[in-house]
């Protein structure tokens, strides 16, 4: 997945101002964006060469999720969703992007590391919006070899997965490290009852007998914007039936197709689980159809749901 590149942006947005990327610094003893309390969001914008337009995909939904996470941790925060909307567009224009871009707003409390254990609702925050180019090319024939992790997925009453916070991702990182050391590409995580949840940073869907199946949002998963997009495409564009229900571990072993979905991952097929081939051991036909439909809608080739795409370079904006 070519999500992180060596390229950096010229500018970053910080607390209401566009500043040079190199000047966006904090002291080493500050809490920092990767602290326990840091909240973030992942958004993508796609360049359409034919239309000469950069589309931010489902910006409003991502900002709503960002604001919901901020609400849950009781941060002091004065920006509205419209303020954030305008800030994202301002940053993209400042960097003069005419290519695919990953956008990451994040927020953390001001202060020193030793203040982390002090409950301070409403404490002042730092708000940053970063961005960087990425390649959206994906070889759909390169499917993942995955395993079921021995690490249990965090739960809503422990560290709620609905909250998009940096610290939650350490749970998935532990599982991912174990998987890679064992020779796999990526793990699938189970909840404390042994039910399938998701992978680190991406939701999981499977296909059985022509029907797409997804664990419900109460299955220790992030409420995924990409997943909701896929559900709409399945119903309106592809006419493929789907359902949300609990998924057993052994269903992964008998699935016809399995794939991960997420803003960063987009659509990523799975070739095997615990060394057992999924379907024929290669990307399945329904996965390919979903990936094609998704690609068309995010780039504006499919003009349905224009409310999903916020144009950056549209005259008058």
Q: Language-model features: where?
A:
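Short, glycine/charge-rich beta-strand/loop segments that flank catalytic centers
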Residues: 80-90, 100-115
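Short secondary-structure junctions
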Residues: 94-101, 238-240
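Helix-start/capping segments and mature chain N-termini
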Residues: 1-79, 86-90, 117-317
